[in-house]
Amino acid sequence: MSRQESSNKFFIKKILREYYSRKPLEEPLYIHKREIAIHSLEDEAYIRHLSFPSITHLYNFILNEKTPLHLYYSSAYYESPSVNKMELKGWIGSDLMFDLDSDHYPGCDKILSICIEENTIYDGKIKTCPKTESKPVIHPLIKTECIQKAYRDALRIKYILEDELGLKNIKIYFSGNRGFHVKVIDEKIWDLESDERREIASYISLENFDINKLFPVIGKRKKYVIITRNEHGIRKRVLDYVIKNNIVNGNELFIKLPLKLLEETINDLTIPIDIVVTMDISRLSRFGNSINGKSGLITKLIEPLDNYEFDINDFCPWSGNIVVKPLIDISGLQVFDEKIDLKRGVKKILDSKIAVYLTLKGIVKIISDEKLVIKNV
């Protein structure tokens, strides 16, 4: 390990332990029946099959033994969560989870590959730096407007689960990076198998939706469908959308909707759920109020509001400025919604959320953190 890597790791360990010393974690239901997993800062190991009788014991572990870059618990409940073999854990049931990433939306998937040793930046994702064959730093260019789109769909998932499927106790979490997790904490759905969970995800997302099965098409030359004022499920979803967006007159007893407009509506109502996550009954999920080691931001519960405006500062546990020494030359690098200029080897004062992010990525070296303050969580 180089001296700069050592100093950066010491800094990250210090701020993470200070943060967790304030006991911010949201305790999941029946923590003693959950598998706990940690991506350890000290040895960069991914440690699974941990179990703790209480959150107090978990705090003792992460404050004294292994500092978590990432901290997870299983969506599943087990009789013996610490057993290494999944088939011997004694599965009791699982929460229902949905995962949304903002890079799945049009115009939101731009990535830079930063080659530190080459002092070069490449558009797109590359596996190795061409000149040195070293591993590049992958830097997604995610804007707030993209995260806002993902939140909008997370809220839509919540409403569908409640209004169409009758489920309750649904929570929306910002992942701490670029997306959202929607969790259903309800014993009624614990025993759902993977195929049943996939069916729910497909119903919500409209993945591979066959219009003809639910909307009989009328006409030969000018094709259309009929929607009445008394609809349920997906048909009501379409009805509400076309009325809300003034696509049709909502005062009529029934709506004659051209097939082309129906197809456009279905496309707009499609939600890019990661169905693999929903199907996985042993999926790991980030602790509420834990730090996401990719960004330095908090995985945080969000109040479900139609008028919610995403603000990255609401998820940053640090305040103040940090002095860093950049390891690369770059002008106008987008970090969150800000653009910064970096000159290799020239000290620069950065806002803490930018500095922590760049430190986690290995793009800068920490020089002084005297002005850094941990916010009240």
Curated annotation (Swiss-Prot):
EC number: 2.7.7.-
Enzyme class: transferase
Keywords tagged on the record: DNA replication, DNA-directed RNA polymerase, Magnesium, Manganese, Metal-binding, Nucleotidyltransferase, Primosome, Transcription, Transferase
Keyword set includes Manganese: yes
GO MF annotation, one: metal ion binding
Segments traversing the membrane: none
Cellular component GO terms held in the UniProt record: DNA-directed RNA polymerase complex; primosome complex
Family in the record: Belongs to the eukaryotic-type primase small subunit family.
Function text: Catalytic subunit of DNA primase, an RNA polymerase that catalyzes the synthesis of short RNA molecules used as primers for DNA polymerase during DNA replication. The small subunit contains the primase catalytic core and has DNA synthesis activity on its own. Binding to the large subunit stabilizes and modulates the activity, increasing the rate of DNA synthesis while decreasing the length of the DNA fragments, and conferring RNA synthesis capability. The DNA polymerase activity may enable DNA primase to also catalyze primer extension after primer synthesis. May also play a role in DNA repair.
Database matches in HAMAP family: DNA_primase_sml_arc
Protein name per its UniProtKB record: DNA primase small subunit PriS
